[in-house]
């Protein structure tokens, strides 16, 4: 009995000979690439990575991220209030920063402005 690798190599060699008889120039280079992929490298099981049926995959366990303490609704409400307060403060600060440049030109002149103004 021949192994699967030898059978695959024989099939590819037969296809190469058949295409050479037909005069295909491009096809042999493609089959050489395929034979490289199908031939399998060292340490691989025969048959390559082609599997039939379902593949078992490990399901990640995220239980370590879930806190196991009892959450009180009052605490959640306090967290929401604190978060909303922080957002309002951030909005206020950004508004002040944006208006600072605008308000610099809108300030009224001081009373003694004309005493020190060099422009007549």
Swiss-Prot record:
Cellular localization per UniProt: Cytoplasm, Cytoskeleton, Spindle pole; Nucleus; Cytoplasm
Highest taxon listed in the record's lineage: Eukaryota
UniProt-annotated stretches for the region Disordered: 1-54
Coiled-coil blocks: none
Chain segments carrying region Interaction with alpha-tubulin: 31-120
Tissue-by-tissue expression: Very high expression in heart, skeletal muscle, liver, and kidney. The levels of expression are uniform throughout the brain.
PTM comment, free text: Ubiquitinated and degraded by the proteasome.
GO MF annotations in UniProt: alpha-tubulin binding; histone deacetylase binding; metal ion binding; molecular function inhibitor activity
GO CC field: cytoplasm; cytosol; microtubule; nucleoplasm; nucleus; spindle pole
Keywords: Cytoplasm, Cytoskeleton, Metal-binding, Nucleus, Ubl conjugation, Zinc
Region annotation Interaction with SIRT2: where it falls in the sequence: 31-90
Annotated residues for binding of Zn(2+): 117
Biological processes per GO annotation: chromosome segregation; negative regulation of protein ubiquitination; negative regulation of tubulin deacetylation; regulation of cell migration; regulation of cell population proliferation
Chain intervals with Low complexity compositional bias: 8-27
InterPro entries in UniProt: BEX, TF_A-like/BEX
Known partners and oligomeric status: Interacts with alpha-tubulin. Interacts with SIRT2.
Function per UniProt: May play a role in microtubule deacetylation by negatively regulating the SIRT2 deacetylase activity toward alpha-tubulin and thereby participate in the control of cell cycle progression and genomic stability. In absence of reductive stress, acts as a pseudosubstrate for the CRL2(FEM1B) complex: associates with FEM1B via zinc, thereby preventing association between FEM1B and its substrates.
Family membership: Belongs to the BEX family.
Protein name: Protein BEX4
Source organism: Homo sapiens (Human)
UniProt gene name: BEX4
